[in-house]
Amino acid sequence: MSGGRRKEEPPQPQLANGALKVSVWSKVLRSDAAWDDKDEFLDVIYWFRQIIALVLGVIWGVLPLRGFLGIAGFCLINAGVLYLYFSNYLQIDEEEYGGTWELTKEGFMTSFALFMVIWIIFYTAIHYD
């Protein structure tokens, strides 16, 4: 017997119904991906919205945007980008997920809260006298 360690093999891809299970991240970037699990797709919409809120909060905080213009801009960009993503890029049937309104409002309030916190923190840190 040798004193060396046994080399562990990498884990095999998970099988789902006899087919290879595709990762969620590879589905997000492919326009022809099939979304079999409704909750998985709604999670993607939720986290995509959080990323948009984080990025826009930093941009709005660095730029001296204030008031209604900043909030309205966030709402339009956030809803618009996601609508374009799921209707034009993925070309999914919105009715399978409860309609366009359900997908548009999925995770909106939490992303709005995140946006406000990040916007206030960055604006205060950079522009506060």
From Swiss-Prot:
The chain crosses the membrane at residues 45-65, 67-84, 104-127. InterPro entries: EMC6-like (IPR029008), RCAF1 (IPR010742). Disulfide bonds: none annotated. It is a multi-pass membrane protein. It holds the Pfam family EMC6. Expressed in neuronal cells. Keywords: Endoplasmic reticulum, Membrane, Mitochondrion, Mitochondrion inner membrane, Transmembrane, Transmembrane helix. Residues 1-44, 85-103 are cytoplasmic. GO terms for biological process: mitochondrial respirasome assembly; multi-pass transmembrane protein insertion into ER membrane. Its main location: endoplasmic reticulum. Residues 66, 128-129 are lumenal. GO terms for cellular component: endoplasmic reticulum membrane; mitochondrial inner membrane; mitochondrion; multi-pass translocon complex. It is found in: Endoplasmic reticulum membrane; Mitochondrion inner membrane. PANTHER family: GEL COMPLEX SUBUNIT OPTI (PTHR12906:SF0), PROTEIN C20ORF24 RAB5-INTERACTING PROTEIN (PTHR12906). Component of the GET- and EMC-like (GEL) complex, composed of RAB5IF/OPTI and TMCO1. The GEL complex is part of the multi-pass translocon (MPT) complex, composed of three subcomplexes, the GEL complex (composed of RAB5IF/OPTI and TMCO1), the BOS complex (composed of NCLN/Nicalin, NOMO1 and TMEM147) and the PAT complex (composed of WDR83OS/Asterix and CCDC47). The MPT complex associates with the SEC61 complex. Interacts with NDUFS3, NDUFA4, NDUFV1, NDUFA9 and NDUFS8 of the mitochondrial membrane respiratory chain NADH dehydrogenase (Complex I). Belongs to the EMC6 family. This is GEL complex subunit OPTI. The gene is Rab5if.
